[in-house]
Regions:
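Beta-strand-rich globular domains of non-transmembrane regions
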Residues: 15-16, 20-24, 65, 73, ...
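Contiguous, well-ordered alpha-helical segments that form the cores/surfaces of helical PPI scaffolds
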Residues: 72, 85-92, 385, 400-407, ...
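Compact, glycine/acidic-enriched structural inserts
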Residues: 85, 91-139, 208, 214-217
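Acidic, metal-ligating active-site segments
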Residues: 43-50, 55-104, 109-111, 185, ...
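Amphipathic alpha-helical scaffolding segments
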Residues: 81-89, 103-106, 124-129, 196-203, ...
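Domain-level detector for long, ordered catalytic/regulatory cores in large eukaryotic signaling
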Residues: 1-49, 59, 114, 135-389, ...
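A short acidic (Asp/Glu
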Residues: 75-79, 120, 168-169, 193
Length: 577
């Protein structure tokens, strides 16, 4: 493995004026009403400050977030090889800085070729030891902004991971019926007889208000089942979880006999080990310790919706096994097998061939603003009537911006509406600022949205990814608008170190020095010409550079109107009017 100590890099943040003056932003800024724009506005951050006041009193002490994810560096060569970087991010910086590449510090690089799984803790031992040292003793650091030495300390606030990595770091198994780390043993998930898969169908009525009509419905959910009086058990504290792990006898992955002991205990419990993060003395007091990765959940939800609506063979959740047991679970005779033909009828949420072609041809023609999204037309397969090769950001854009428009004329209103509500939910949840009022509303609305979807889609549609959104508002409420995890894909130790050295050295240049790095916009170059004509509107001063060969054509009337509108909306000179 490769380990890059975090302490010297945290000290370097105070060695340059470009960063040192921003390191107390979290303590100096004032929250705008009940709107959270940074993790420091969150209840989890404030609770940590209350419990550890000595640490919080020094605003220069650093609070960190950790993320880890695997990647395949040799996918183009067909070789199975998985590497796992572990990245730390300081949250002291303002929102516009803390998620930039130069402030995402690669600390551990676990080599392949295999996924380390629950043995990940073995590779995290030096990091946890260093974090304990930074918490208990700290390190003397020179603050170039205040021109004084101080004892720098650091604390890990939480981790942010996709679902498989969540299990590796937290010790809670994210596979099987107890996969949800919030419901835990109190889950209502069940195993489908035909496919053997776990289903979270009809697991969301307990989150509804006590008098909601869905709770008494015995036809649209599981047959004859009411959810009267049942409620979500609530989120357990770190002290409660640690006490349970110790009572059951789980061991850390690197302790003697851990493999056999943990394997036996995990057969009857949701835990698979005692996480190494419990070695941090403050970890049990953290309000939230492991965050779900919203982008990962959103992508999986989108894939399930889109593949089911397009009825993609092998990927749709509405397959023969699902239909065979559908009416054993819920009352939907209209989707039962036709005894005369032996076939299952088309569901109202599935598109016919003509509608699929209309949808995919529309996607091929979509044009986005430069840098907004990738070219989705490359993902369209008109021959197979499906989409392929969509990345997480492609799914993110499609789910939040295109899905309601794309399906509005193609699906019945009772199907389109809850899908649109789910799209709006993800759009609001991933906004850069969140108000308490909006989060309370989202926490109330998401169970209703999921229940509406349960009245439409089959039980096989609802895997753990369709269930997890019900817990996302709570995480956002506790931790604030935590930006999506960073990923240093394809980085190797030598190349990463060279890049980090170059970035850090650049911060030693004086302010105003032309060699200080400036992030240019897309399609900009250092030698871009600027027209200094005072009478010319600001939007026309930069001289454009063509991206490809030139041509000539006349604009249509609607194109002229669109161009004029864009200019009027983006000229600072006319804002007063």
């Amino acid at each position: 493995m490769f380990y890059f100590p975090i302490t010297p890099r945290l000290q370097r943040l105070y060695a340059s004026k470009a960063t040192a003056r921003h390191m107390t932003w979290h303590a100096d800024h004032e929250m705008d009403g009940d709107t959270m724009c940074h993790p420091s506005d969150s209840p989890a951050w404030k609770r940590f400050s209350e419990l550890h006041s000595e640490f919080a009193d020094e605003g220069r002490n650093i609070r960190l977030g950790l993320c880890s994810d695997g990647f395949q560096p040799f996918t183009n060569f067909g070789q199975q090889y998985s590497s796992w970087p572990v990245i730390l991010t300081p949250y002291n910086l303002p929102p516009g800085m803390c998620m930039k590449d130069e402030f995402m510090f690669l600390t551990v690089l676990v080599p392949g070729p295999r996924n380390p799984k629950h043995l990940m803790d073995i590779f995290l031992q030096p990091l946890i030891a260093e974090l304990n040292q930074l918490w208990e003793c700290g390190v003397q650091t020179y603050d170039v902004h205040k021109r004084q030495n101080f004892q720098l300390k650091a604390a890990l606030m939480w981790t942010i991971n996709d679902f498989p990595a969540y299990s590796m770091l937290s010790g809670w198994s994210t596979a099987g019926r107890k996969a949800c780390p919030y419901c835990m043993e109190n889950t209502d998930a069940f195993t489908l007889d035909k496919s053997g898969k776990q289903s979270w169908f009809d697991c969301h009525r307990k989150f509804l208000p006590p008098n909601h009509q869905f709770r008494r419905n015995v036809t649209d959910f599981r047959k004859g089942k009411r959810e009267v009086g049942k409620r979500f058990a609530g989120v357990r504290t770190g002290d409660e979880l640690l006490a349970e792990i110790d009572r059951l006898g789980f061991k850390k992955a690197f302790e003697p006999g851990a493999k056999v002991t943990n394997a036996l205990l995990s057969k009857d419990h949701g835990w698979n080990k005692k996480s190494i993060f419990w070695d941090l003395p403050y970890w049990r007091t953290n309000v939230i310790r492991h965050n779900l990765d919203v982008m990962h959940i959103e992508k999986n939800v989108f894939d399930n919706i889109f593949n089911t609506v397009l009825n993609v063979p092998g990927k749709t959740k509405d397959h023969a096994k699902s239909r065979e047991e559908l009416n054993d679970i819920c009352d939907r005779p209209g989707l039962a097998k036709d005894p005369a033909t032996g076939r299952f009828p088309k569901a109202m949420y599935a598109l016919d061939r003509d509608s699929k072609r209309v949808l995919l041809e529309w996607i091929q023609k979509i044009k986005f603003p430069d840098g907004y999204a990738s070219n989705l037309s490359r993902c369209v397969d008109l021959k197979g009537l499906k989409m392929h090769g969509m990345k997480s950001h492609d799914c993110h854009v499609f789910m939040q911006r295109l899905l309601p428009i794309a399906l509005r004329e193609l699906l019945p209103k009772n199907v389109w509406e809850p899908l649109t509500e789910l799209s709006i939910f993800f759009r609001e949840l991933t906004s850069t600022s969140l108000s308490q009022e909006d989060l309370n509303r989202m926490e109330t609305e998401i169970p209703k949205i999921l229940c509406k979807l349960e009245r439409i889609f089959p039980p096989s549609f609802f895997d753990s990814m369709e269930h997890l959104p019900v817990h996302l508002p709570y995480e956002a409420m506790m931790a604030g608008p935590v930006t999506n995890k960073g990923r240093v894909e394809g980085s190797v130790s030598s190349g990463y170190l060279q890049e980090e050295i170059a970035k850090f050295a650049s911060y030693y240049f004086a302010e105003g020095d032309p060699m200080l790095p400036v992030r240019l916009g897309r399609n900009e170059t250092c030698d871009m010409d600027i027209d200094e004509d005072a009478d010319r509107l600001g939007i026309f001063k930069p001289k454009g550079k063509p991206l490809r060969g030139s041509g000539r054509r006349y604009l249509e009337d609607d194109e002229i109107i669109a161009a004029r509108t864009y200019v009027l909306l983006n000229c600072s000179e006319i804002e007063d009017y």
